[in-house]
Regions:
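Alpha-helical structural segments
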Residues: 3, 10-34, 48, 52-56, ...
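Residue-level recognition of oxygen-bearing side chains
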Residues: 7-10, 66
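Solvent-exposed, amphipathic alpha-helical segments
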Residues: 22-33, 67, 122-130
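Short linear capping/connector segments at secondary-structure termini
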Residues: 37-43, 71-78, 107-108
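Helix-turn-helix/homeodomain-like alpha-helical modules used for DNA recognition
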Residues: 41-69
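Amphipathic alpha-helical packing segments from all-alpha helical-bundle domains
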Residues: 52, 56-63, 76-103, 114-124
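C-terminal peripheral helix-coil segments that are non-catalytic and often amphipathic
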Residues: 63, 93-100, 116-162
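C-terminal/domain-terminus segments
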Residues: 71-88, 142-155
Length: 162
């Protein structure tokens, strides 16, 4: 095996790379499609984009369930150990762009890029818990929909506080 992959990390990367790259591309495609909309339209379609995007990501993950179990729980020491953090960075960047475009960010706002990062990390960690707990797809979808309502409601409260 190692003659083909070089070492254990080479084998690991050969297994998880297609899944990791595919999910990242789905996530970026959703972000870019959302941000291509006019700023005043974005808040109106936000919930739909988020729910549809989460469903698409969930189906992608569950179609490659074992790959994502490895990626999430066995990637320490590989180039994929920060995979979730990479998704968080993308979410943070695009959320910040959204808040600037829709003028939710105002001078003196308590909402900082660091706060956005922390909230994005909480969202992704909770999203991937369904994989770590080996939930079946239908149960995972129900949990993700509840989590999304939770995060969406929380953001609504934070934005009102501004």
């Amino acid at each position: 095996i190692y003659s083909r992959f070089g070492d254990k990390e080479g084998l690991f990367c050969a297994i998880v790379e297609p899944a990791a790259e595919g999910l990242t591309q789905i996530f970026l495609k959703t972000q870019e499609a959302f941000h291509a909309r006019e700023a005043e339209e974005q808040p109106k379609v936000m919930e739909t984009y988020v729910m549809d995007g989460m469903d698409e990501m969930l189906d992608y993950v569950y179609d490659r369930f074992d790959d994502f179990r490895l990626l999430l729980d066995a990637s320490y020491g590989t180039k994929y150990q920060d995979f979730v953090e990479h998704l968080v960075d993308i979410e943070t960047e695009y959320t910040y762009k959204y808040m600037e475009a829709t003028q939710f960010l105002q001078e003196g706002s308590m909402i900082t890029e660091e706060f956005l990062h922390i909230m994005s990390r909480a969202m992704f960690d909770s999203m991937f818990e369904v994989v770590r707990h080996r939930m079946d797809r239908d149960t995972a979808r129900k949990y993700l929909h509840m989590l999304e309502k939770y995060h969406y409601g929380g953001w609504g409260a934070i934005i009102k506080l501004g």
